[in-house]
From Swiss-Prot:
Lineage top rank: taxon: Bacteria
Organism: Dichelobacter nodosus (strain VCS1703A)
GO cellular component, one term: cytosol
Keywords on record: Cytoplasm, Methyltransferase, rRNA processing, S-adenosyl-L-methionine, Transferase
Top EC group: transferase
Signal peptide: none
Catalyzed reactions: guanosine(527) in 16S rRNA + S-adenosyl-L-methionine = N(7)-methylguanosine(527) in 16S rRNA + S-adenosyl-L-homocysteine
Protein name: Ribosomal RNA small subunit methyltransferase G
Enzyme Commission no: 2.1.1.170
Function in brief: Specifically methylates the N7 position of guanine in position 527 of 16S rRNA.
Gene Ontology molecular functions: rRNA (guanine-N7-)-methyltransferase activity
Length: 211
């Protein structure tokens, strides 16, 4: 591991210590393995715009980790528009008892996701290489999460068939001023998120289907 990644691991350990739940060294090492895989693939494929390891720790890893306390235990969770596996792979590493689906239609990104899942030995993760609106899982999902949502209402429309009134849609946003206009949904809560080492606002929209 070069100096950049050594410094990044130290930063991750510092940031993880500020989270509201414990993160052990085994998890830290697996997260750094993921970051090294991402760096390797980024040299050939443009998976993420942020390439500096310490910045990736803050904007990718810690920004994903802060939502872990809001995931219900022993549930099926789909990361919609997973991209390079954010937040899905990060959450799957810290929540090994939960089943994750990484839904990503972009071919180069879904290929990377499969390779990352293989190399990280994430037995609780499956990659779904298709658009969310085309996917029909065997059962309704308990949680649908995304940090790639530009418009909440379009996202809810595309993913409505994947959950029911017992499901939760967790949408990570920079601002809390969006309004849900989808008639079959309502916003149950808007939770402020504090990302360690990041001087920027983050909120989590918790959305449910009406009964």
């Amino acid at each position: 591991m070069n100096d950049d990644f050594i410094a990044a691991e130290e930063l991750l350990q510092r940031g993880a210590a500020a989270l509201s739940f414990p993160v052990n060294q085994e998890v830290i090492e697996k997260l750094m393995h993921y970051l090294q895989l991402l760096a390797k693939w980024n040299r050939v494929h443009n998976l993420t715009a942020i390439r500096e390891p310490q910045q990736q720790v803050i904007v990718h890893l810690l920004d994903s980790l802060v939502v872990a306390p809001f995931l219900p235990p022993a549930q099926t969770i789909a990361d919609i528009g997973s991209g390079a596996g954010l937040p899905g792979i990060v959450l799957a590493i810290v929540c090994p008892q939960q089943q994750f689906f990484l839904v990503e239609s972009n071919t180069k990104k879904s290929v990377f996701l499969r390779e990352a899942v293989r190399q990280l030995a994430l037995e609780n993760v499956k990659v779904v290489a298709m658009r969310a609106e085309q996917w029909r899982p065997e059962a309704k999902l308990n949680v649908l999460i995304s940090r790639a949502v530009s418009d909440i209402n379009s996202f809810l429309m595309w993913t409505a068939a994947l959950g029911d009134e017992n499901s939760r849609w967790l949408l990570m946003k920079a601002h809390d001023d969006e309004v849900c206009t989808q008639k079959d949904f309502y916003v149950e809560n808007v939770l402020p998120l504090t990302v360690p080492l990041l001087d920027a606002a983050r909120v989590l929209f918790v959305v449910k289907k009406k009964s």
